[in-house]
Amino acid sequence: MAARKMITASVTAATALVAVLATGTPAQAKTTKFCGPPAAFTLGCFYSEGDYFTVQDMRADGKRGVLKWQTDYGRKGECHDANGANNPPTKCDYDFKEGHTVLFQTAVRNGANGADEGLSNPMIAWISGR
């Protein structure tokens, strides 16, 4: 009798395990848009599908919005929005290596080479769109 209960329990457990493994999990949607903090003076986003940034100056102070970026493999650069505050964002297109990360943050500058002001917290994004 005890052996029969043990076999029944084992078969039930095995059946449950097969059911769980056969069902699988739903595919996860990949994230393709990574944006910085919404309260920043300059808004910045990275779009992993297309490898581009957008940067938008949100403060009417005569200064420009700047997005600074650096990949985990050493490449770096900047994207500038000098078309005035509250206008459509500036798009900067790049071609990055897939499967890496990019760190970016935004700032406000007086001219292209001015000192960074109002530097946002850094954001990290997957270049591969995971």
Task: Identify the role of each PLM range.
Residues 28-130:
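Post-signal peptide N-terminal regions of Sec-secreted extracellular proteins
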Residues 1-43:
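N-terminal prepro-regions of secreted/extracellular proteins
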